[in-house]
């Protein structure tokens, strides 16, 4: 729940390759601010950023490209290679990410009546208490796997490994105030998002 009663904060989440980014763009087009956790992480993993320094201290220079930037594909392979590595990554990066998200949350809560936070691992990382509502973008495992393979140029095995590293859709459902089914067309999704925003503004 948001700390400022007059401000409504909505958490947006969904599995990898669920189409959440498309929903974010629709929300932005409707005029709402969205804090993007993935972009925040990307910025902090840039050369010299807080996460860049933390990852370099942990894994050493083998995760760097020749120009000094992070080798993101190699980093992903290392982290997703086993559960111990994934948990250690979550510990190291999670604290820093939470601090940065909290700062952005506090800033927008002073300026906006309604805003969104796009956090892929919102439930897995225990962010649910931050929000007045949680919107979950949902797709079938088959659609999710196909989209992830195409988007990230992964094999079936690699895609399933990344999907299986996250909480399942069934486990996330009880936390959701609203489920946006994205197994259909783009137009179907637009209508669902438009309806959800209309309901939001009419009740606020």
List PLM regions with ranges.
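Walker A (P-loop) phosphate-binding motif
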Residues: 2-32, 37-39
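Generic C-terminal helix-cap and adjacent flexible tail
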Residues: 4-6, 198-204
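An amphipathic alpha-helix signature
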Residues: 30, 52, 56, 141-146, ...
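Well-ordered beta-strand positions
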Residues: 33, 39, 133, 177-178
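ATP-dependent small-molecule kinase phosphotransfer cores
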Residues: 42-113
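Residue-level signature of catalytic and energy-coupling elements of molecular machines
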Residues: 89, 116, 180
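Small-molecule kinase domains that catalyze NTP-dependent phosphoryl transfer to phosphate-bearing small molecules
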Residues: 100-101, 108, 129-130, 150, ...
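ATP-dependent NMP and nucleoside kinases share a basic, alpha-helical "lid"
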Residues: 102-110, 114-151
């Amino acid at each position: 729940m948001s700390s400022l009663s007059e401000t409504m904060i909505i958490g947006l989440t969904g599995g990898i390759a669920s189409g959440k980014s498309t929903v974010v763009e629709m929300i932005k087009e409707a005029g709402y601010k969205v804090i993007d956790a993935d972009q925040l992480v990307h910025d902090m993993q840039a050369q010299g950023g807080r996460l860049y320094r933390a990852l370099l201290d942990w894994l050493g220079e083998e995760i760097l490209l020749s120009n000094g930037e992070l080798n993101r594909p190699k980093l992903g392979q290392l982290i997703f290679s086993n559960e111990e590595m994934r948990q250690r990554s979550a510990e190291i990066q999670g604290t820093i990410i939470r601090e940065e998200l909290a700062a952005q949350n506090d800033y927008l809560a002073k300026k906006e009546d309604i805003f969104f936070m796009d956090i892929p691992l919102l439930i897995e990382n225990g962010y649910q208490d931050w929000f007045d509502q949680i919107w979950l973008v949902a797709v079938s495992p088959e659609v999710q796997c196909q989209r992830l393979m195409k988007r990230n140029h992964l094999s079936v095995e690699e895609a399933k490994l990344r999907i299986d590293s996250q909480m399942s859709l069934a486990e996330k459902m009880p936390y959701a105030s609203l489920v946006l089914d994205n197994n259909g067309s783009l137009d179907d999704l637009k209508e669902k998002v438009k309806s959800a925003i209309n309901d939001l503004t009419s009740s606020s």
